[in-house]
């Protein structure tokens, strides 16, 4: 009798477990999409892809690359597209980026949209011109204490057809990077030693994608060039992780491979005859160089152009000889370097202070019509904010203040 009760108990327990498993599998089948779905793009092109991923990556796997400066984190809002069917309801992570009208029209962040069923989406036509390359590191020296000039060589016969001020996306695989293994030239090692940056380790368990403005201009073919600043934890914040992509970039050596996607962009020069004033700082040098070289060397522009760049000290200023030469060769161009913290060894006799103050005191204060100029800027957030406020106080309209948020 006891044995029979035990057997019945085991049978009942097994039946309950099997029933629960069946319920879970049924629920999973309803909630987790499997199999392939069809995504119709712009009412014309169709791609078949496995369900379950995010729309941004699903499109990328099919060779359609939407811009995503934040690498799919839902913060930059550059991967927006229209999802007219099959996308479900807008998520709370998307709502701050769109108006109610945008939501009604179907705008979504593709990095937040799950691919669960057949979908209809609309993307900008220029997206179809975006390509992917596996590039080779040609060089990666420091040009300032915390900034590398990364030059990548494209595959033989390939070229990035971009406009000055454009950007591409770099992809880093999962990796572990030790700062102690970085190649930092002797003249720049002082602050690395002072702040003991060698102790940091960047460990990344998944693919990382970030956007960087190009420092080369369209006539410099066969390569892409960047000015990339290391994003190490601030002093006293050792518990914060280092920048994932910048740490990876600082570890790259000649001959290494890295994937590049692009081109993208919206920080383009206006086609007018207005005076152009460029303002930069830090790694914001990249799009400044691209624009200025394009205007003077490719377009042979006769517009009045000036460039105002801020750095801490002489050691942190780069491309100075290139700009000196441009100034000698072009009577319509002049450039000004201002140091906020010149060192005794600099023997600096030039302009000092923060670049927005120098620009105002040295030029805009007595300019007859600053509101008629076009201002292009890229630099650290505090610099950008200070320059924008100054320009607004001078009566410059927003459409004449162009900002690249990538280069700081």
From Swiss-Prot:
Function, in words: NQR complex catalyzes the reduction of ubiquinone-1 to ubiquinol by two successive reactions, coupled with the transport of Na(+) ions from the cytoplasm to the periplasm. The first step is catalyzed by NqrF, which accepts electrons from NADH and reduces ubiquinone-1 to ubisemiquinone by a one-electron transfer pathway.
UniProt keyword NAD, yes or no: yes
InterPro entries referenced in this protein's UniProt entry, alphabetically: 2Fe-2S_ferredoxin-like_sf (IPR036010), 2Fe-2S_ferredoxin-type (IPR001041), Beta-grasp_dom_sf (IPR012675), Cbr1-like_FAD-bd_dom (IPR008333), FAD-bd_FR_type (IPR017927), FNR_nucleotide-bd (IPR039261), NqrF (IPR010205), OxRdtase_FAD/NAD-bd (IPR001433)
Membrane topology qualifier: Single-pass membrane protein
Transmembrane residue ranges: 6-26
Family: Belongs to the NqrF family.
Claim: Repeat is one of the keywords in the record: no
One Pfam family, short name: FAD_binding_6
Co-factor(s): [2Fe-2S] cluster; FAD
SUPFAM superfamilies named in the record: 2Fe-2S ferredoxin-like, Ferredoxin reductase-like, C-terminal NADP-linked domain, Riboflavin synthase domain-like
Gene name of the record: nqrF
Principal cellular location given in the protein's record: membrane
Record domain FAD-binding FR-type: where: 130-270
Major enzyme class: translocase
An MF annotation (GO) of this entry: electron transfer activity
Protein name: Na(+)-translocating NADH-quinone reductase subunit F
Record note on quaternary structure: Composed of six subunits; NqrA, NqrB, NqrC, NqrD, NqrE and NqrF.
Keyword annotations of the record: 2Fe-2S, Cell inner membrane, Cell membrane, FAD, Flavoprotein, Ion transport, Iron, Iron-sulfur, Membrane, Metal-binding, NAD, Sodium, Sodium transport, Translocase, Transmembrane, Transmembrane helix, Transport, Ubiquinone
Subcellular location: Cell inner membrane
Binding site for [2Fe-2S] cluster: 70, 76, 79, 111
């Amino acid at each position: 009798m006891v044995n029979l009760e035990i057997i019945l108990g085991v049978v009942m327990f097994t039946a309950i477990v099997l029933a629960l498993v069946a319920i879970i599998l049924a629920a999973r089948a309803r909630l987790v999409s499997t199999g392939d779905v069809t995504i119709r793009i712009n009412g014309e092109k169709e791609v078949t892809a496995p369900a379950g991923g995010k729309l941004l990556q699903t499109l990328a796997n099919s060779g359609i690359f939407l811009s995503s400066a934040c690498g799919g984190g839902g913060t930059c809002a550059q991967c927006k597209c229209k999802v007219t069917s099959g996308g479900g309801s807008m998520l709370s992570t998307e709502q701050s980026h769109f108006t109610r009208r945008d939501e009604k029209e179907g705008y979504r962040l593709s990095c937040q949209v799950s691919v669960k069923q057949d979908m209809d989406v609309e993307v900008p036509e220029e997206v179809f011109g975006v390509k992917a390359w596996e590039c080779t590191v040609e060089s990666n020296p420091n040009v300032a204490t915390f900034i590398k000039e990364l030059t990548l060589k494209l595959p033989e016969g390939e070229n990035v057809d971009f406009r000055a001020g454009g950007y591409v996306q770099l992809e880093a695989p999962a990796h572990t990077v030790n700062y102690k293994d970085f190649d930092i030239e002797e003249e720049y090692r002082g602050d690395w030693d002072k702040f003991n940056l060698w102790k940091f380790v960047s460990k990344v368990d998944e693919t990382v994608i970030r956007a960087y403005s190009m420092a080369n201009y369209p006539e410099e073919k066969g390569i892409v060039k960047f000015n990339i600043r290391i994003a190490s934890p601030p002093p006293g914040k050792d518990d914060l992780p280092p920048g994932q992509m910048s740490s990876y970039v600082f570890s790259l050596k000649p001959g290494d491979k890295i994937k590049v996607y692009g081109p993208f962009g919206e920080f383009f020069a206006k086609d007018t005859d207005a005076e152009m004033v460029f303002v930069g700082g830090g790694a914001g040098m990249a799009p400044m160089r691209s624009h200025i070289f394009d205007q003077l060397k490719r377009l042979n522009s006769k517009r009045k152009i000036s460039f105002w760049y801020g750095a801490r000290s002489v050691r942190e200023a780069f491309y100075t000889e290139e700009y000196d030469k441009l100034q000698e060769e072009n009577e319509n161009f002049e450039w000004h370097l201002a140091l906020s913290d010149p060192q005794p060894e600099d023997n600096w006799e030039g302009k000092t202070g923060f670049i927005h103050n120098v620009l105002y005191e040295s030029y805009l204060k007595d300019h007859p019509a600053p509101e008629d100029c076009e201002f292009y800027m890229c630099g650290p957030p505090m610099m950008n904010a200070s320059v924008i406020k100054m320009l607004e106080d001078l009566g410059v309209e927003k459409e004449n203040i162009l900002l690249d948020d990538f280069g700081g």
